[in-house]
Amino acid sequence: MAELSTVARPYAEALFGAACDDKAGLVSWADLVGELAQVAANADVREAMTDPRLNDAQRAQVFTSLIKSPLPQAARNFIDLLVQNDRLLLLPIIATQFVDLKNRYEGTAQAEITSAFELSDAQVKELIAALEVKFGLKLKPQVTIDPSLIGGVRVAVGDQVLDTSVKAQLARLRDTLAA
């Protein structure tokens, strides 16, 4: 996976640069890149894009025909480049890196909050306010429920994880007692 991320990075950076230069703006490009990634992740599309009977022009034409949003010329050129370099199937990874670049540019980050119980909007806002101070970023929360945590929350922001769940505390206690 690390190798694919390394291969995808220059494409994500180039796409991000093009999006910053485009008057349509980052938000519309982020939506478009998300749609491109969804289409590229589809199993039938992946199979079609590896069909040896199709040449590069046909692959690009088939792929662009599956996109519902209007494609600016820069996006068409990007798709052509990916097809020529046999990198079209990296679009989901490129999209993830694009979102990371966009978030870094905007000074924001995705906060994946996993809770044992459903959190009210007020609880999420209070938690996000405290986490924004801790991480120094504007956070976009994504809340999921996992009853196996027993209680508490686990928060992932980028590669940092803050786990205050009862399950994690019990695991630490077990490890301490076993040592």
UniProtKB/Swiss-Prot annotation:
Pfam families linked: OSCP (PF00213)
Gene Ontology CC, one term: proton-transporting ATP synthase complex
Keywords: ATP synthesis, Cell inner membrane, Cell membrane, CF(1), Hydrogen ion transport, Ion transport, Membrane, Transport
Subcellular localization, as worded in the UniProt entry: Cell inner membrane
Coiled coil spans: none
Primary location: membrane
Membrane topology recorded in Swiss-Prot or TrEMBL: Peripheral membrane protein
Alphabetized HAMAP family for the sequence: ATP_synth_delta_bact
Function text: F(1)F(0) ATP synthase produces ATP from ADP in the presence of a proton or sodium gradient. F-type ATPases consist of two structural domains, F(1) containing the extramembraneous catalytic core and F(0) containing the membrane proton channel, linked together by a central stalk and a peripheral stalk. During catalysis, ATP synthesis in the catalytic domain of F(1) is coupled via a rotary mechanism of the central stalk subunits to proton translocation. This protein is part of the stalk that links CF(0) to CF(1). It either transmits conformational changes from CF(0) to CF(1) or is implicated in proton conduction.
Protein family membership: Belongs to the ATPase delta chain family.
Protein name stated in the entry: ATP synthase subunit delta
Species this chain originates from: Bordetella avium (strain 197N)
